[in-house]
């Protein structure tokens, strides 16, 4: 198929939207990509080949789905907007390796879908242009569920991509960085200007790649408690670790006790949460956890 016939061009996208009298729903964060080269970059970074399978979230009118269908073995796309189903049937009609599921990804049993649609042991990648308003819940569900997928390569708001891939002592580093990086290795592979979308959003985007870890990079006694400690440490970014944790443990440990536990963990209480590595947070959480039942 020649490039000008691809869905992801301004003229073809306008034709499809006009044919179906489609209007964008702001509540669903619908912004369609109209630059084929950006899509092909996503496919390349995602490592999609004819041996791999792909899961897409929010296919829209099928621009990314089409590129996945061309390059992957099998594609399953989750679409929540019923109005798009007949459009997808039309635009993707020639691709026999695409299945569209009308379901909210947050309610889907993705592991079951993988088992039912893909070959046993096949390498699976999640590839998506995610709606900005629900990016974090979707990604956190997918990585916390520890799906049998190799990576997630997603187009998201640049600011969120920076936060998810943030490193200690940077403005973007916080509890979200640590949550994402506990389950995956995160890196921004490409920045994408807002001009390549229809309608044009107010912000620029980035392509973020999350490579799933087989094991977390740190050992923690209790995962929930570990993430509670992290959240508490960033509750007020300008405050010290000691002050934030004193507030968190109010009625349980006084300031003196918190100082003592932090010393035992080998971390100075005068530091701020943004300066701690994941290893240091694990040490702090594991040390405090020992005192939970004392």
From Swiss-Prot:
GO molecular function: 16S rRNA (adenine(1518)-N(6)/adenine(1519)-N(6))-dimethyltransferase activity; RNA binding
Binding site residues for S-adenosyl-L-methionine: 31, 33, 58, 79, 104, 129
Recorded GO CC terms: cytosol
SMART domains: rADc (SM00650)
Keywords (A to Z) from UniProt: Cytoplasm, Methyltransferase, RNA-binding, rRNA processing, S-adenosyl-L-methionine, Transferase
Intracellular or extracellular location(s): Cytoplasm
Primary location group: cytoplasm
S-adenosyl-L-methionine as UniProt keyword: yes
InterPro entries: KsgA/Erm (IPR001737), rRNA_Ade_diMease-like_C (IPR023165), rRNA_Ade_Mease_Trfase_CS (IPR020596), rRNA_Ade_methylase_Trfase_N (IPR020598), rRNA_adenine_dimethylase (IPR011530), SAM-dependent_MTases_sf (IPR029063)
Catalytic activity: adenosine(1518)/adenosine(1519) in 16S rRNA + 4 S-adenosyl-L-methionine = N(6)-dimethyladenosine(1518)/N(6)-dimethyladenosine(1519) in 16S rRNA + 4 S-adenosyl-L-homocysteine + 4 H(+)
Keyword set includes RNA-binding: yes
Record-listed E.C. numbers: 2.1.1.182
Record-linked PANTHER family: DIMETHYLADENOSINE TRANSFERASE (PTHR11727), DIMETHYLADENOSINE TRANSFERASE-RELATED (PTHR11727:SF7)
Protein family according to the UniProt entry: Belongs to the class I-like SAM-binding methyltransferase superfamily. rRNA adenine N(6)-methyltransferase family. RsmA subfamily.
Role, per record: Specifically dimethylates two adjacent adenosines (A1518 and A1519) in the loop of a conserved hairpin near the 3'-end of 16S rRNA in the 30S particle. May play a critical role in biogenesis of 30S subunits.
Protein name, UniProt field: Ribosomal RNA small subunit methyltransferase A
Species in which this protein is naturally found: Oceanobacillus iheyensis (strain DSM 14371 / CIP 107618 / JCM 11309 / KCTC 3954 / HTE831)
